[in-house]
């Protein structure tokens, strides 16, 4: 009985190990990703969508062909256009909606009023957690490069924008999936151009 108890205690406190970081974007092609080829393209070492000349007609997503569970994701991004309307985001623990251009899952949001926030796309359709306006005023950079770090471990989700922790969220709904694809978004409804690069992921696992 004592041996079993010690095992349960040990197993409950297993350290989380990170694999070597892997790049999800080769800087030249969209290999490993799937999406509307009329929307998504590669320019100067970045994944690009949208336009500064015409409004983006609808939400579009570029999705990984692989699914992920626990991980730490780092993405460098830039958003341009109408500052009040331009919006984008990085989806994770997400799935494609069959026969539809939309996806469903968590999003690290980008844009006026949403910087650094955790949004639930096409599911609960609301901001789940986010930083104060004062934090965003000091952290977010429109029309310049920004860094998002997204860390998922079990039901814990943390977001960092340019090194500042903006979300520390615990998902209480056990029905919400803890695995899924990663996707890049350009939001419809405004003149928006979004660029993503330096996309790396470290998959996390418990030490045996």
Over which residues does each language-model region extend?
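Compositionally biased regions
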Residues: 6-8, 206
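Hydrophobic h-region of N-terminal signal peptides that target proteins for export
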Residues: 9-18
């Amino acid at each position: 009985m004592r041996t079993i108890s010690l095992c349960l205690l040990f197993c409950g406190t297993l350290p989380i190990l990170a694999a070597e970081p892997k790049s999800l974007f080769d800087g030249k092609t969209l290999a490993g990703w799937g999406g509307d080829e009329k929307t998504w393209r590669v320019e100067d070492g970045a994944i690009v969508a949208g336009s500064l000349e015409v409004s983006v007609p609808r939400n579009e997503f570029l999705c990984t062909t692989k699914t992920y569970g626990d991980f730490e994701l780092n993405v460098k991004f830039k958003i341009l256009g109408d500052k009040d309307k331009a919006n984008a985001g990085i989806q994770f623990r997400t799935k494609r909606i069959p026969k539809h251009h939309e996806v469903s899952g968590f999003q690290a949001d980008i844009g006026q009023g949403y910087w650094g926030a955790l949004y639930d796309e096409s599911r609960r359709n609301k901001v789940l957690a986010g930083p104060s306006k004062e934090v965003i005023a000091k952290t977010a950079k429109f029309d310049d490069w920004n860094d998002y770090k997204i860390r998922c471990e079990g039901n814990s989700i943390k977001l960092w924008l340019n090194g500042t922790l903006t979300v520390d969220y615990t998902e209480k709904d056990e029905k919400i999936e803890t695995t899924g694809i990663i996707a890049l978004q350009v939001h419809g409804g405004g003149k928006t151009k979004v660029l993503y690069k330096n996309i790396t992921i470290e998959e996390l696992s418990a030490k045996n």
